[in-house]
């Protein structure tokens, strides 16, 4: 039956649907339209897929029909897809009861029938149907008088059905599926998706972690399939866009029916093939393991192919087949026809089997005889976890029995296994899995060397075509590339990228650095290119960009080489090093004894280079770099300004003495003038008679000469730094504070010098009045201010300096043997540590690099990095952070991140960037400062001119208020001096520094204090924005809750003399130990803790049924119970909450403990228990009856938001376990504090509304958005922002990244050092919700301090400048220039000191708030909570349900929360942390949660 196309399919986007009723309305109305065969509407996808007759309808008419119903229909793609139709042959098997016309009319009215041809003479009908809409059996049911013509059907379609060939219009989809751990997972996915309508075939590969699905796009979409896989509990990603299949029925018919023909143009017959032959094909166009799987699965379905092995590395396939049925040419065409039709196939070799004896001439034509000369391969597998020779013997004994394994040798010292095997019977991956199944970690090597092909020698023919050809084909080259990765938020993202990239063909190793946002990938350039790798990362949902030059010379080494005497030594070192593999460049300078080397750290390390130079007879050592934080504590600047101040002070003291002397003498003369009525001439003579006023030369007095001599060194030595900075500013066409200072002092000095020279030139008898006293006093106060300012600035960076000081300077590298015994220790510089080194850290020592503990137990102080006050326990497998301090035990760690890639280095970089970033308010201050200096200069000039005018118009004002005025000076000179004094004072008192320091100093202290408390604030903008926040939105899972389920209660449902509680825990823990579900892991963890053991019994026949539960058989638990001592048993009984259904007293329970005596017999030790664990439905399926008491207990747990599961042992209901994701202890307090701060608190989650309501009631949140998809969280945050509210989003950074980025302030909570760098504005290193309160509180305190600083700065300038300009002269308020400089210095110092008050900040802690009464905290009743479901704002207030409705809803919620595949398609939530729907209960209603 060859398919034809008589129908089309179109997908139309439909907007405006709100509920299932809309879906049904559209389906009913459009389904009635003439020419529409089938319609499927998806509310979630907002689309309608319609199959229609193109002769009667068009996409445009269908779009208009939906528009007419009141919905918005959009046609994005007007090109319809053809829909497959089949032909059904019907014959009359009995006398007709209906006329042929009636039969034809009935069939044509049937949906899915596109044509009917009636043949009354042949008493038959040919009906064209759409098989996806209607089936042949349904057609027969419509017309009972007709029956299927089976002979015709078999004749037409037998071949197609037999081989399940793809049909026209079918689409093949490849999806990456994560989280699969065993074949049970693959069976679950195949069973779930295979039942979906429109899915034709599905094949799930555990090795490749992918699923290949063939489906009909008009019935189901790729997105729906993806969500169904995620509903089972496995994250899925569409790997490639779906493609239509090309291999049709005709291809398989050609394979089966094509006769054996000689090649075109061949003059002789092709050789006769024996019954069993093998041929090797060369295949071009394969890219990954998916291609290998595709070819193997396609050919293995053919009857005449007995086996096929495809090698991606060798680009070849070895096919074993029945030569009497098929030829190599037919197989070649079959491979080329396999979808996607990209393979180019050629026959590499044709051979005969040993079943016949080929002639010598035949053999000469065959280059490779694989059957008569058995082909084998050798694989080397890395095996970790072996501890002794018993492990070696165990592996060799088991693997040697596997089919196809010829020999195996396992090396304990090298942790490898070398296996020789037959590739036709097994593969390296199968052998690796077999070793892993034994409990060892097995991995295939990074493909540095190809598999070794081994064969038996042959006398007739050579085994391989040629060694050169084989070497060319199988040589593998490794390159390295760096890719910048954005969007990573935590360690889960890192693991996701590394795990998925390693699966891609041609990629050898991947190392991703979270903090640096960089991935280092080693790959085979013949197989894959960096841009393709970047595309793979983008397909995983991250941003990726190839770093072009990152890999070039990424290792740079500076060495001091001693012992060189001439140029010959230089040449010897350079030539020797450049010959080494991995060294790109080497330059040695004899004059400086330094060597500059660029190298590849993957190939050679710095210690290797130093050793090589040492072997040449020279001594090489690392150039010491300054790792101190001197640049942060401003020591250099402090020393500089202290020197400037002391120089200025040394010369200023005599100047001030002279000034004071002259002021006293002038006051004395003024008193004499007033008391004795002296004339002006007498006053002048008396003034000139003073010692300091005596003239050495005409016009040059002693006073002016001393002032000049004292002013010169201050002006040009003490003020040198000011001149340098002012020159640089003017050079770049800007003006700053230094320009004002230089202007003021230079004008005063220049004016004084010029007027003095003029007086000397004119031989004046009256000494001119100079300003030589002004520069020394100005520089003294300004230098003092700068000195104090830099001391204060050093304090602002104290936090960052502390972080930098944490970095270790040396590391102890150890060498271990194969038994992990210490061979040697070596103390090296921390810069010489290489990735993969084993480092020993003694008690009290600092961890030099990030790493993973491989041996030892200790407590580690991470307080200065994470803010966590309590030491953290470390054991093998734990990660450690560079800079943290080891406390009480020696540890061996393996370096994972070194140098600038360590977490500490990245945090230091982050804090440095934050302290140098500008807040919006600072940008305003900077803009203001840009206009400030020109404005002050203008004011100074205006002040000068105005006072000159006023002085000449009304001299009495100047005479009255000018300090030190005496009549010996002329009026003009007095006016000019007074005007200059006011002008210079304006220049001195104006201070843009205070404006410029107001924000950055506060930001530096604020971010530093935050870093010390485990709060990383990324710059001034989020620090300023956080205080404006009005709404705080919390994610649920991992933020409000812990994100991991725990056991809340265990109820024993049988008498304790039948089975004890400990025995139930031992059996349940053993059964759940094989489960990968988080609920199972929680139960296992609880059982191990209660039994105080790390090992459990044996579990066999383990089966998991998604949506229900598990079943298995458990043995070997009596020995486990025997090891439990009496003290642990008594503590368990005391602490556990045991609820007995059939009452039995406590004494009886204790006395009948099931602890087994030491003389247990072997028969008892091997007792087997049949175990069932699951929900109600699972128990009912297995024929168990649930009593009302048990049912009520489950309902009560479900009401509190817990998941309740039942336990059956040997067909008897024994226990009930309640499991929940617990709320963090500080969550309720944090919400209460935020509300008391005037903030609105909202809970947003992808979980169901019932769970969300339960969580909200416990922590006191009254507004909830439930069942919100991750993509909709962004829309919800935006919606709150459109209401005029500033939003802070708090999430764990896994699926909340888009919402964190959209919020005004994104706050990411990290666990330990897993910090969300990219998405969030604020990163909380500790997993503590009170840090959310602290971050907002710190922001408020910092912004308040910034405002206080601005008040200080503005007061000085707005009040000081008018005073200096003489505006308040009429009321007697006037300033000298030195007073202005003192005020200016005080303004800068006061601003910095004000910022330093932030160092007194103490973040709120749990204990602090617990001391205060919390009468307003506590739970909210359900009626107080407003729950909004989905993206719309439909609020669900507390429902009022009857008893029966409550039971039904709670039961359904329990089943749905336990296993998500019972949900409808529209309720599937793609949020990974919420996918288990772990409900959190109220732990305060009673005490039954005590275990």
Curated annotation (Swiss-Prot):
Topology of this chain in the membrane: Multi-pass membrane protein
Residues that hold Cu(+) 5 according to the record: 490, 493
Cellular compartments annotated: Golgi apparatus, trans-Golgi network membrane; Cell membrane; Melanosome membrane; Early endosome membrane
Cytoplasmic compartment residues: 1-644, 726-732, 794-926, 1003-1347, 1397-1491
Positions that bind Cu(+) 6: 566, 569
Modified residues (Phosphoserine): 270, 339, 353, 357, 362, 1421, 1423, 1451, 1454, 1457, 1460, 1464, 1467, 1477
Record-annotated active site: 1035
Record-level Gene Ontology MF annotations: ATP binding; ATP hydrolysis activity; copper ion binding; copper ion transmembrane transporter activity; copper-dependent protein binding; cuprous ion binding; P-type divalent copper transporter activity; P-type monovalent copper transporter activity
Tissue specificity annotation: Widely expressed. Highly expressed in pituitary endocrine cells. Expressed in melanocytes (at protein level). Expressed in motor neuron (at protein level). Expressed in hippocampal neuron (at protein level). In the kidney, it is detected in the proximal and distal tubules (at protein level). Expressed in aorta (at protein level).
Segments on the Extracellular face: 667-705, 754-772, 951-980, 1366-1376
PROSITE patterns named in the record: ATPASE_E1_E2 (PS00154), HMA_1 (PS01047), HMA_2 (PS50846)
Deleted gene: phenotype: Cell-specific silencing in motor neurons is associated with loss of motor neuron cell bodies and progressive denervation of the neuromuscular junctions with aging, consistent with the clinical features of human distal spinal muscular atrophy X-linked disease, 3 (DSMAX3).
One Gene Ontology term, aspect cellular component: trans-Golgi network transport vesicle
Record: residues binding Cu(+) 4: 388, 391
EC number: 7.2.2.8
Function: ATP-driven copper (Cu(+)) ion pump that plays an important role in intracellular copper ion homeostasis. Within a catalytic cycle, acquires Cu(+) ion from donor protein on the cytoplasmic side of the membrane and delivers it to acceptor protein on the lumenal side. The transfer of Cu(+) ion across the membrane is coupled to ATP hydrolysis and is associated with a transient phosphorylation that shifts the pump conformation from inward-facing to outward-facing state.
Record remark on domains: The ATP binding site comprises residues located in alpha-1 and alpha-2 helices and beta-2 and beta-3 strands, which are involved in van der Waal's interactions, and Glu-1072 which forms a hydrogen bond with the adenine ring.
Subunit structure: Monomer. Interacts with PDZD11. Interacts with ATOX1 and COMMD1. Interacts with TYRP1. Directly interacts with SOD3; this interaction is copper-dependent and is required for SOD3 activity.
UniProt similarity note: Belongs to the cation transport ATPase (P-type) (TC 3.A.3) family. Type IB subfamily.
Protein name: Copper-transporting ATPase 1
Organism expressing this protein natively: Mus musculus (Mouse)
């Amino acid at each position: 039956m060859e398919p034809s196309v008589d129908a089309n399919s179109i997908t139309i986007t439909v907007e405006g649907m709100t509920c299932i009723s809309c879906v049904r309305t559209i389906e009913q109305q459009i389904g009635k339209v003439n020419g529409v065969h089938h319609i499927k509407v998806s509310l979630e996808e907002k689309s309608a897929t319609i199959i229609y007759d193109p002769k009667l309808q068009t996409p445009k008419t269908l779009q208009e029909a939906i528009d007419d119903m009141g919905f918005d229909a959009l046609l994005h793609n007007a090109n319809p897809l053809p829909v497959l139709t089949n032909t059904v042959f019907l014959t009359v098997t009995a006398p007709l009861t209906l006329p042929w016309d009636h039969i034809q009319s009935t069939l044509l009215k049937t949906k899915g029938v596109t044509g009917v041809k009636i043949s009354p003479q042949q008493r038959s009908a040919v009906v064209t149907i759409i098989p996806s809409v209607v089936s042949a059996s349904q057609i027969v049911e419509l017309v009972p008088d007709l029956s299927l013509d089976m002979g015709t059907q078999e004749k037409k379609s037998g071949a197609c059905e037999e081989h399940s060939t793809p049909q026209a219009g079918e689409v093949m989809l490849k999806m990456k599926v994560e989280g699969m751990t065993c074949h049970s997972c693959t069976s679950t996915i195949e069973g779930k998706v295979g039942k979906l309508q429109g899915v034709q075939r599905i094949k799930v590969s555990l090795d490749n972690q992918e699923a290949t699905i063939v489906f009909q796009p008009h019935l189901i979409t790729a997105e729906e399939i993806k969500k169904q896989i995620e509903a089972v509990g496995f994250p899925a990603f569409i790997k490639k866009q779906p493609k239509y299949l090309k291999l049709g029925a005709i291809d398989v018919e050609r394979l089966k029916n094509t006769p054996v023909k000689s090649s075109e143009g061949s003059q002789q017959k092709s050789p006769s093939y024996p019954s069993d032959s093998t041929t090797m094909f060369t295949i071009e166009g394969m890219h990954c393991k998916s291609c290998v799987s595709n070819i193997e699965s396609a050919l293995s379905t053919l009857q005449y192919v007995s086996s096929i092995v495809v090698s991606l590395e060798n680009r070849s396939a070895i096919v074993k087949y029945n030569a009497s049925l098929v030829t190599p040419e037919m197989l070649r065409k079959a491979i080329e026809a396999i979808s996607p039709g990209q393979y180019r196939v050629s026959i590499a070799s044709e051979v005969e089997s040993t079943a016949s004896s080929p002639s010598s001439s035949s053999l000469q034509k065959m280059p490779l005889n694989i059957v008569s000369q058995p082909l084998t391969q050798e694989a080397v597998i890395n095996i970790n976890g072996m501890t002794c020779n018993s492990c070696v013997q165990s592996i060799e004994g088991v693997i040697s029995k596997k089919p196809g394994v010829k020999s195996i040798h396992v090396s304990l010292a090298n942790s490898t296994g070398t296996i020789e095997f037959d590739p036709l019977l097994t593969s390296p991956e199968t052998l690796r899995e077999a070793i892993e199944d034994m409990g060892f970690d097995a991995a295939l090597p990074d493909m540095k060397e190809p598999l070794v092909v081994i064969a038996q020698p042959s006398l007739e023919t050579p085994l391989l075509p040629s060694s050169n050809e084989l070497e060319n084909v199988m040589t593998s080259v490794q390159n390295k590339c760096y890719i910048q990765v954005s969007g990573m938020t935590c360690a889960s993202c890192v693991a996701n990228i590394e795990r998925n990239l390693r699966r891609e063909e041609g990629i050898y190793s991947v190392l991703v650095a979270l903090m640096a946002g960089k991935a280092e990938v080693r790959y085979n350039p013949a197989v894959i290119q960096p841009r393709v790798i970047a595309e793979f990362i983008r397909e995983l949902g991250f941003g990726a960009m190839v770093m072009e030059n990152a890999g070039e010379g990424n290792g740079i080494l500076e060495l001091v080489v001693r012992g060189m005497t001439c140029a010959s030594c230089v040449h010897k070192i350079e030539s020797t090093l450049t010959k080494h593999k991995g060294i790109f460049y080497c330059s040695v300078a004899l004059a400086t004894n330094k060597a500059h080397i660029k190298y590849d750290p993957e190939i050679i390390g710095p210690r290797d280079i130093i050793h090589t130079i040492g072997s040449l007879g020279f001594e090489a050592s690392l150039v010491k770099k300054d790792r101190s934080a001197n640049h942060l504590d401003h020591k250099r600047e402090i020393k500089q300004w202290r020197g400037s101040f002391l120089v200025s002070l040394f010369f200023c003291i005599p100047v001030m003495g002279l000034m004071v002397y002259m002021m006293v003498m002038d006051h004395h003369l003024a008193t004499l003038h007033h008391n004795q009525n002296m004339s002006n001439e007498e006053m002048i003579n008396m003034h000139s008679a003073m010692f300091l006023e005596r003239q050495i030369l005409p016009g040059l007095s002693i006073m002016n000469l001393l002032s000049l001599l004292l002013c010169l060194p201050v002006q040009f030595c003490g003020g040198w730094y000011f001149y340098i900075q002012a020159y640089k500013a003017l050079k770049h066409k800007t003006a700053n504070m230094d320009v004002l200072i230089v202007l003021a002092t230079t004008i005063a000095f220049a004016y004084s010098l010029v007027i003095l020279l003029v007086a000397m030139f004119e031989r004046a008898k009256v000494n001119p009045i100079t300003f030589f006293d002004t520069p020394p006093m100005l520089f003294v106060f300004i230098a003092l201010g700068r000195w104090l300012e830099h001391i204060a600035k050093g304090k602002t960076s104290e936090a960052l300096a502390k972080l930098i000081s944490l970095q270790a300077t040396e590391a102890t590298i150890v060498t271990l043997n194969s038994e992990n015994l210490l061979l040697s220790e070596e103390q090296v510089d921390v810069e010489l540590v290489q990735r993969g080194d084993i480092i020993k850290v003694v008690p009290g020592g600092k961890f030099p690099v990030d790493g993973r503990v491989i041996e030892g137990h200790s407590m580690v102080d991470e307080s200065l990095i994470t803010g966590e006050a309590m030491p953290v326990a470390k054991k093998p497998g734990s990660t450690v952070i560079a800079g943290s301090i080891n406390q009480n035990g020696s540890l061996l760690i393996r370096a994972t991140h070194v140098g600038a890639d360590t977490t500490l280095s990245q945090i230091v970089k982050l804090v440095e960037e934050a302290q140098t970033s500008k807040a919006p308010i600072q940008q305003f201050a900077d803009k203001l400062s840009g206009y400030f200096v020109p404005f002050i200069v203008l004011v100074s000039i205006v002040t000068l001119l105005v006072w000159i005018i006023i002085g000449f118009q009304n001299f009495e004002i100047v005479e009255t208020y000018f300090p030190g005025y005496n009549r010996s000076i002329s009026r003009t000179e007095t006016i000019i001096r007074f005007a200059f004094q006011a002008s210079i004072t304006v220049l001195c008192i104006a201070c843009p520094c205070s404006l410029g320091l107001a924000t950055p100093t506060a930001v530096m202290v604020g971010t530093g204090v935050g870093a010390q408390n485990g709060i990383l604030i990324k710059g001034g903008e989020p620090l300023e924005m956080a205080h404006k926040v009005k709404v705080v939105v919390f994610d649920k899972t991992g933020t409000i809750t812990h994100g991991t389920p725990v056991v809340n209660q265990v109820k024993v449902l049988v008498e304790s003399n039948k089975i004890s509680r400990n025995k139930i825990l031992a059996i349940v823990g053993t059964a759940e130990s094989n489960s990968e579900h988080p609920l199972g892991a929680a139960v296992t963890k609880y059982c191990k803790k209660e039994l105080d053991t790390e090992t459990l019994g044996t579990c066999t026949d383990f089966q998991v049924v998604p949506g229900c539960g598990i079943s298995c058989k458990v043995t070997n638990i009596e020995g486990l119970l025997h090891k439990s001592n009496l003290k642990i048993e008594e503590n368990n009984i005391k602490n556990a909450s045991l609820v007995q259904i059939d009452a039995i007293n406590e004494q009886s329970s204790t006395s009948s403990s099931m602890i087994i005596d030491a003389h247990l017999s072997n028969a008892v030790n091997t007792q087997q228990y049949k175990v069932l664990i699951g929900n109600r439905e699972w128990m009912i399926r297995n024929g168990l009856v649930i009593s009302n008491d048990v049912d009520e207990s489950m309902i009560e747990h479900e009401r509190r938001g817990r998941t309740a599961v039942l336990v059956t042992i040997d067909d008897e209901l024994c226990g009930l376990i309640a499991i929940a994701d617990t709320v963090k202890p500080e969550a309720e307090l944090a919400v209460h504090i935020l509300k008391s701060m005037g903030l609105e608190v909202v809970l947003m989650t992808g979980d169901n509304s019932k769970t969300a309501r339960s969580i909200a009631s416990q922590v006191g949140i009254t507004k909830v958005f439930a069942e919100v998809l991750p993509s909709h969280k962004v829309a919800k945050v935006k919606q709150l922002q459109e209401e005029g509210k500033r939003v802070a989003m708090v999430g764990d950074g896994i699926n909340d990244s888009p919402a964190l980025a959209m919020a005004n302030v994104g706050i990411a909570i990290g666990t330990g050092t897993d910090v969300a760098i990219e998405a969030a504005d604020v990163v909380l290193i500790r997993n503590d919700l009170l840090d959310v309160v602290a971050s907002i509180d710190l922001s408020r305190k910092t912004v308040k301090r910034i405002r206080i600083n601005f008040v200080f700065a503005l007061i000085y300038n707005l009040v000081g400048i008018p005073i200096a300009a003489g505006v308040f002269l009429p009321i007697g308020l006037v300033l000298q220039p030195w007073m202005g400089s003192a005020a200016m210095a005080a303004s800068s110092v006061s601003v910095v000191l004000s910022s330093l008050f932030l160092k007194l900040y103490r973040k709120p802690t749990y204990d602090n708030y617990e001391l205060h009464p919390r009468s307003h905290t506590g739970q909210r009743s359900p009626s107080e909570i407003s729950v909004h479901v989905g993206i719309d704002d439909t609020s669900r207030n507390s429902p009022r349900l009857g008893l029966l409705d409550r039971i039904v809803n709670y039961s359904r919620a329990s089943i749905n929360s336990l296993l998500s595949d019972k949900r409808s398609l529209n309720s599937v939530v793609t949020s990974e942390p919420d996918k288990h729907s772990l409900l959190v209960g109220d732990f305060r209603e009673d005490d039954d949660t005590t275990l």
